[in-house]
Amino acid sequence: MDGQQLRSSESPASGGGGVTGGGAPHLFHALGPALLISIGYIDLGKWVAAVEAGSRFGLDLVLLALLFNFMAILCQYLAACIGTVTGRSLAEICHQEYSRPTCIFLGVQAGLSLLTSELTMIFGIALGFNLLFEYDDLITGICFATVVPNLLPYAISHLGKKMVGTLNACIAGFALLCYVLGLLVSQPQIPLTTNVIFPKLSGESAYSLMALLGANVMAHNFYIHSSVVQGQKRSAFAVGALFHDHLFSVLFIFTGIFLVNHVLMNSAAADSTNTLLLTFQDVVELMNQIFVNPMAPTIFLVVLLFSSHIISLTSAIGSQVISQHLFGINLPLSGHHLILKAFAIVPALYCAKVAGAEGIYQLLIICQIIQAMLLPSSVVPLFRVASSRLIMGAHRVSLHLEILTFLAFLLMLFSNIIFMAEMLFGDSGWLNTLKGNTGSPVVFPSTVLITVACVSVAFSLYMAVTPLKSGSHEAELQQEWSVPSQKELLNTTQDREETCAGNVTYEEDQRSDVVPSPRIQPVDCLKSALDYIDSSDTAIESDHDSQHSTAHTSTAPESCHSPSFIPEESKSVVAVDWPEPLEPISNAIVAEESTVESVDSKSTGERDIEVEPALLMDNDKEAPNILESDNKPLGGNNPSCASDDGPPSLTFSRGKGSDAGNGSGSLSRLSGLGRAARRQLAAILDEFWGHLFDYHGKLTQEASSKRFDILLGLDVRTPSSTVRADSQANEIPKSPMVRDNLQGSAFLGSSRDLMSTKNEMSNLDLTYGLQMGNNIGSSAWSQGMQLPSTQLQSSSNSLLDQGARLNSNFSTPSYADNNQFYQPATIHGYQLASYLKQMNANRNPYSSMPLDPQRLPKSSASAVPTYVDSVMHARNQNLLASLGATPSQIAATSRIGTMMAERSYYVPSTLDGNENAGSSAYSKKYHSSPDISALIAASRSALLNESKLGGGTIGSQSYLSRLASERSQYTNSVARPAAPLAFDELSPPKLPGDIFSMQQSPNPSARSLWAKQPFEQLFGVSSAELTKSEFNPAGRSGGMTKDDFSYKESEAKLLQSLRFCISKLLKLEGSGWLFKQNGGSDEDLIDQVAAVEKLLQQGTSDNQLLLGDTQQPPCDKADIQYMRVLPNCGDDCIWRASLVVSFGVWCIRRVLDLSLVESRPELWGKYTYVLNRLQGILDPAFSKPRSALSACACLHRDIRVLNSLRHSSLVATNSIPRQIRGSFTTASVVLEMIKDVETAVSGRKGRSGTAAGDVAFPKGKENLASVLKRYKRRLSSKGQQ
């Protein structure tokens, strides 16, 4: 199509009849293009963005959505004004005003925006096809969506141009009407919120914020709108009226679109709380709960089918305009159709094949985000052209509207900058989902998204500082034309008319120069859609000559000067003889139009007609540009569970029972929790609490026998073992949650008991046992010596060569047959520095493990009186001397004896040991040195395998080989006093290598006095096996009763069960949502515990791989193995019975959160079971006072050790416990949640006439309401106390 045909093209949606200049026909001409453009804002991606924002953040983003809607109205209005005034599209003006590289970049952005719109349209039709015909094959749906929208244009191609334009307008209007009225009328139950809610922004909401921005404003629509209306040229008297018509049309249509978005957000917010929907099926099912009329989803799908035709048409128009003017490529419309479909169907098929329904949902949101990324740089040319006096003349935007455009640009730019900063430096849940850390399929690489965001922001800043080519000459033009001469002021009216006539001819040539290269003639009905011309244009343009004289005679003399873009080019253009095809252009049309521009551009005070567009926004509130992050880390080394799954190496593989990818049948997958995951969650919680409470919240018989009532504070009876207390002893607290805070002095008997003869060996055991802590860094050894696993790995060769040197501590007899398994009982404290220096000096030069001789062990502050210490010291020295120990051994023994233990703990593997082997029923394990059990286990397997491969030679094995052998003995022997080692071919059944092995134990059934501990074997330190109670107050006998053991055993098993339950919860797909809620100190504590457990689980397997352990246990066995030893960092450790109470509060809140959005009666029943059992935790959680929780070293140290695997040194961890953020969950908070659940569940209903609607839903509601009523009754009574 040549320049004449380009000027005469009109909107394909213009369906008005003859236009004589009245207001109504002008309105129809403006309404057609607006309807055509608005269909692009009602596709599936926009709908999903609104529902997702409302389901996750409620009404927090409604005000910002309103601002985005105003921005869309402003942009579309300016685009219509540009096309109407200049008669050119925005792409054509950009081609003239910007350099070629800039135009190409703008064209790439517009093309990407077109592609994302086409992609969302294909997905919308495909999913609509599947839902309408109940067909599950997405590939077939995509093929259907690719072919069907192209059939209608060819079906109506035989119709006339005017009929095609009218039909397009009717289709667009019908689709928009069904979309708006269908969704507004179909759901009267949800009240619309009229209160203005100030936006509550955070890093988590940046994702939904960008999706809403891209859903409300699209960059390619600017070019399409200006191109569609560019043929609607009117006289100066009609331009102002057209402006009002365009404003009214855009405002009317986009107001309806915003109402629909607001209804969707409000409905999703009322029916869901903090929900992340992952599939379109989830969205449809959620909407089924909201809408009363079951026809609403069907109407929406029909709208998608009708709108696909309009979107396909506008995409082809936009592609043609963009490619012709910004790229300089001329293709027919059919070619643009094929190109768009080809580029859109490839990612659609790939996403459907690889990612499924969940991936399609994520891609729909990402498409909206990409649209938002392209906006800041795309609106700069629009705003610059609209405010340019040289281009728009008298119709440039007003100052107030120019300020609004500037604020709109800042809002878009700040939104992109915040999103980019969150992607680069944030740790939000949606970012982990984009990176694939949550187990969700990665449909779009996050690195590509970050790159697009950074490039878009940089290009936006470049465009902001780059003026138009005509703007760069504005000063020169103003200097040339703004100062009128005195001669012009004295000219007569005839002279002024002659001047105007000259300018008419000049402007005619100049306007001809503006017309770009001819356009390609469209084919068939696509041609008719673009070339439809209203018959009324001839009548309007026939009066132009008479309007010229009126315009010229009523203006000042100087107002006849014509503006030019480049004066040098204008002079040359005047002398050019135009070719013949351009002559038919009406000179009267161009001359009149150019004269009006020259008149109004130089005399703003004397205009023919002054029409100021009304302001589009009644408020100029600037959106905040600072997002307040709610998920701040609690410390530099304490990652929060809000980081979902962390790096990819920390992502857990789901268990056998989980069903990843269950997207098509799941309702609202709460941040990845699908239907199967929610079912598994309920089963896990029911299993754990089923060991404690029955379905009435009463303690089970098994739990009562294990004293769980005392542990949890359900029964305040004093244990029978505490009845025999001396009058001088302190009163024993009745609740074990208070007993957890007792110091080591409570474990020591009185001096009378310590000096008794029959307890000398027991006291000696006690002296040596009290030195051992239970967690890393809890004792002096952990503060003085901490070796990371990388050090052990890098210096394993040096340790193998130097290990034998550590065997010279004691001059005790050894056996030549098995001396490779001999291990010294201990390393003297005063010899430690020399040993470290010697190892450091003789180590392998390739070793990177520095042994710091300055880190000497420091004695812990003793909590017992000095008199007791002196008595113990004297008695132990006498006993050691009587057993034949050397003075150096006695000195080392006394030094170790002064080290106090913070707390002790029973190892479950020994608690459930075989009592027939002759051991006591209960035995303790004391842990002091750093937890390197995983390293010992790894080195054991590797070295033993090496030993076997080497022919089983015993005498040549090194120190770590003996450690591995004894580690095997420790892990495979269960409380046997003289049990043979696991590797009989390597070691005889009995090893008398210790200095006390020659002395008979006073208790024949006791285990070996110098049994090696896994944490001590690396340093050669042995610990005593105590047979005394941990809780032994002053004044009591040194003996131990079974009640004391029962208490500690019960606490151990309870905490082990809790730890195993958390580990299973972490393996649920999408478990990140469970551990990133901000609900107070209980939830924060459980979140941090879960984070540490996750790192420890992965750290165990990583250490085995790091040290070359080829025989790795299965996942479940590995978890059980590493959980045999619970962490314990002292009296402030969180691993105590009160942690179970916090976990109970956490479970109540999670189950209520799930019940708030659950719509399946089967899961209602499972939640009811869990809530029934959790009634038992209400008393200790809400009736009794609880002390403030502190983040102990267990929540920090383990993370630091795991994170230091690749460093050469590790700083000792002695952090001060800090308070857990937030306060305890109160009964009133739970009552509010229960009210919300009751309201949400009462509105759920199934389809009438079905078993689900008539039986399952009512019964499920009844059961859930029953347990919630019991909760309300019990919590209400507790709140009044």
Swiss-Prot record:
Record field: compositional bias (Basic and acidic residues): 599-610
Cellular-component GO terms for this entry: plasma membrane
InterPro entries membership: EIN2, NRAMP_fam
Mutant lacking the gene: phenotype: Mutant etiolated seedlings display insensitivite ethylene-response in roots and coleoptiles. Mature mutant plants have reduced shoot length, increased number of panicles and reduced grain yield.
Tissue expr: Expressed in roots, leaf sheaths, leaf blades, flowers, developing seeds, germinating seeds and young seedlings. Expressed in adventitious roots, vascular tissues of the seminal roots, lateral roots, the connecting region between vascular tissues and lateral roots, mature leaf, mature stem, tips of adventitious roots derived from the node, shoot apex, young panicle, anthers, pistil, stigma, ovary, seed coat and fruit coat pericarp.
Record's compositionally biased regions (Polar residues): 548-557
Coiled coil feature spans: none
Protein keywords: Ethylene signaling pathway, Membrane, Transmembrane, Transmembrane helix
Gene Ontology terms for molecular function: cadmium ion transmembrane transporter activity; manganese ion transmembrane transporter activity
Keyword Lipoprotein assigned: no
Subcellular location(s) per record: Membrane
Parts of the chain that traverse the membrane: 22-42, 62-82, 113-133, 138-158, 164-184, 209-229, 239-259, 298-318, 326-346, 363-383, 401-421, 448-468
Extracellular side: 43-61, 134-137, 185-208, 260-297, 347-362, 422-447
Region described as Disordered: 540-565, 593-665
Cytoplasmic side: 1-21, 83-112, 159-163, 230-238, 319-325, 384-400, 469-1281
Membrane topology: Multi-pass membrane protein
Signal peptide range: none
An individual GO BP term: ethylene-activated signaling pathway
UniProt main location, coarse: membrane
Family: Belongs to the NRAMP (TC 2.A.55) family.
Record function comment: Central factor in ethylene signaling pathways that control development, senescence and grain size. Acts as a positive component of the ethylene-signaling pathway.
Additional facts recorded: Plants silencing EIN2 display a stunted phenotype with severe inhibition of shoot elongation and produce high levels of ethylene. 'Mao huzi' means cat whiskers in Chinese.
Name of the protein described by the UniProt record: Protein ETHYLENE-INSENSITIVE 2
Source organism: Oryza sativa subsp. japonica (Rice)
Gene name tied to this protein: EIN2
